């Protein structure tokens, strides 16, 4: 299907929603929430998950109009094109097939006419075999000791996604048992402090390093890889590198040149974007080393269950589609630029940072997929913290400052339940009391009249008034197992894609990260010249020159 040069904002469906905004401005969530039929229609269940979006500033009519917008944007066709392996990442001429990474063995998903699923499972089987060897102790380090500690080196999607999943599983009873005696750490930043923190307390003799870089040229990752190679070599000799370092890469020549056995390189493909790569060897290898492949396979099955739901469910009952349309409504029509992701689960503390990248790198675009400047805003500013920590941090602004739509994520069954004798409720019930209360506090607020009835002094009434009418949605998961973690990941991945499909942008490239890299190269050359030859900074503006001079004059870096 050829792309259309028309912008979505030129369609009747978009204009209809623009006019509808005036109707919504006349409503308040206090009134909308009193309509039980409306609320019931805004609850969706799938596979034990419950989505409640009744606290969105939307009516049944709004949802009908958003579904018309989906039709106008050719959303059905765009989803099909993604699953069919068409090159929907047009600026890089690539398919977008992260769904193939978690597809069942008998599935058929094609890229350039070839079924990629067998290739995916070849890598998964190789990961299972390798991780079993490491975990069983049949593969040992250079001094004959088992490798019980893993450092995964990667940046961006090679780090944020796997870290989110690792953190979510750390306290799951089954995962906890399977990881007994093992450690998994992630090294991302080129700041030497990150290196120091990662190797602190570790013995090179028992450490395996996983270097994640598709091209094996990523500047930050390769500098950290060389640093850890030096750490291993200094302790165990150069020959130990092949026993203590493996790669996730497709550049076997550079892998071998680095000192890693190419047989210990695990592939992934051009049709996997970095921020969508957690289900590839990028995430599956380090997670399998920590928890065992069978645990990670449950995670993949959870993600796959949402893939199938997304592909086959009518839009009015399709969780990622509904979430994506509501985000478009909040950003492009109601004018809310941000979104708070608020999981009431400490195990999900790294979820918001991961989705921040998935969302903002995907949809932070200013032109259409055809290169036309967009006359409307796309993307959201995503941030978040687990509840109840966030309540004591930034909820003040959410309640009485700017309006920020919120995603509340709750878990029915705690990974680590605690009930203290004499307490009114369990620790988890105390947490969930806040999960249920906060959305209503945002929706209903508190009026001056209510405060007067409570005999609040007149001078405090303006300060204690809550306007309410602040949108949120609630997603309730039955528990937080590897399967549920996979579901949660896929829901948000597809939600982000839906937003991009509707806006008519390319959610799968990231040219915005390139310019800074180019400028950093110029600075790097200057620093080298200044350190080795004493040359003064030149060719920069006054501000950068002044900053560079101060840095060079006062830094304690050794002369090279």
From Swiss-Prot:
GO terms for molecular function: carbohydrate derivative binding; glucose-6-phosphate isomerase activity. It comes from the Eukaryota. Pfam families: PGI. The active site is at 361 (proton donor), 392, 517. It is found in: Cytoplasm. Changing residue 99 to I: In strain: cv. Bus-1 and cv. Kas-1. Keywords: Acetylation, Cytoplasm, Gluconeogenesis, Glycolysis, Isomerase. Changing residue 5 to P: In strain: cv. Ag-0, cv. Bus-1, cv. Dra-0, cv. Hiroshima and cv. Kas-1. InterPro entries: G6P_Isomerase (IPR001672), G6P_Isomerase_C (IPR023096), Phosphoglucose_isomerase_CS (IPR018189), SIS_dom_sf (IPR046348), SIS_PGI_1 (IPR035476), SIS_PGI_2 (IPR035482). It catalyses: alpha-D-glucose 6-phosphate = beta-D-fructose 6-phosphate. Inhibited by glycerol-3-P (G3P). GO terms for cellular component: cytosol; plastid. Changing residue 528 to Q: In strain: cv. Ost-0. The modification N-acetylalanine is found at residue 2. Changing residue 73 to A: In strain: cv. Bl-1 and cv. In-0. Changing residue 105 to E: In strain: cv. Hiroshima. HAMAP family: G6P_isomerase. Homodimer. Belongs to the GPI family. This is Glucose-6-phosphate isomerase, cytosolic.
